[in-house]
């Protein structure tokens, strides 16, 4: 699999995390690769509030791409660089139920299909790997009590796992440079925000569409004990290093209210 710039940003930063005894868990998505695989099967990707509408054919493709392509590729590259990593399917970590319908832009209720809401987590294996200084590579898949596999929004999955692990920080790598006052203007980046300010921006419509699951999961993580959340542009060279090891940073940081 051709690596993305987001993967490059992660991989170059891992040795520095390990040098400073930082313990890292990777929860990844696979949006573009999944959409490309769906297109090969003549399936059209559709999103509602940042969630991919997932029918029976789609969930099989999503499971295959995440489990057989993206997770192993990330783990292999970490090992090539001298680190230790192990793939863990989200199906063995996240317990989920079918998500309720969402409203589209017209106000119509849309059945999301096999999209799941997380009801609980089992981090036993994740914690063992973290304690052994092995990087867990986790796919955003959940499993129902009946065995049904669900597609989980990766941002939400990361937040739930971070809360369960009592992580200090979550870093989201996306295709934008952070939260912007004007979503179309990358120079309108907001460097620091509080949870209250995030809620205000949502009410004003500044935060909308695909950013909603990201900021909602961030707020939930902060409320659940995570101290800080960072939003970075994974396409920017050295984005993780610049955010974490420079005074100014390059993305948006949201800190829990003390």
Region locations from a protein language model:
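Nucleotide/pyrophosphate-binding catalytic subdomain
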Residues: 1-235, 242, 248, 255-258
């Amino acid at each position: 699999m051709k690596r993305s710039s987001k993967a490059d940003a992660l991989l170059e930063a891992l040795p520095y995390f390990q040098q400073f005894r930082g313990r890292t868990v990777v929860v990844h998505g696979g949006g573009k690769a999944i959409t490309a695989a769906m297109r090969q099967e003549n399936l059209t990707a559709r999103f509602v509030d940042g969630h991919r509408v997932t029918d029976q054919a789609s969930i099989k493709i999503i499971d295959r791409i995440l489990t057989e392509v993206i997770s192993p590729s990330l783990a292999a590259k970490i090992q090539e660089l001298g680190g230790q990593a192990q793939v863990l399917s989200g199906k063995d970590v996240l317990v989920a139920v079918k998500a309720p319908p969402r409203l589209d832009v017209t106000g119509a209720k849309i059945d999301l299909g096999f999209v799941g809401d997380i009801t609980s987590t089992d981090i036993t294996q994740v914690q063992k790997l973290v304690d052994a200084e092995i990087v867990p590579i986790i796919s955003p898949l959940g499993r129902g009590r009946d065995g049904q596999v669900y597609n989980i929004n990766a941002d939400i999955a990361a937040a739930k796992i971070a809360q369960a692990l009592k992580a200090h920080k979550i870093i989201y790598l996306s295709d934008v440079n952070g939260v912007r006052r004007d979503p179309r203007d990358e120079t309108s980046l907001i460097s620091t925000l509080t949870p209250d300010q995030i809620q205000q921006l949502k009410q004003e419509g500044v935060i909308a569409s695909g950013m909603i699951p990201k900021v909602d999961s961030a707020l939930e993580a902060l409320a659940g004990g995570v101290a800080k959340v960072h939003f970075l542009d994974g396409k920017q060279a050295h984005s993780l290093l610049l955010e974490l090891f420079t005074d100014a940073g390059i993305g948006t940081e949201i800190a829990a209210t003390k």
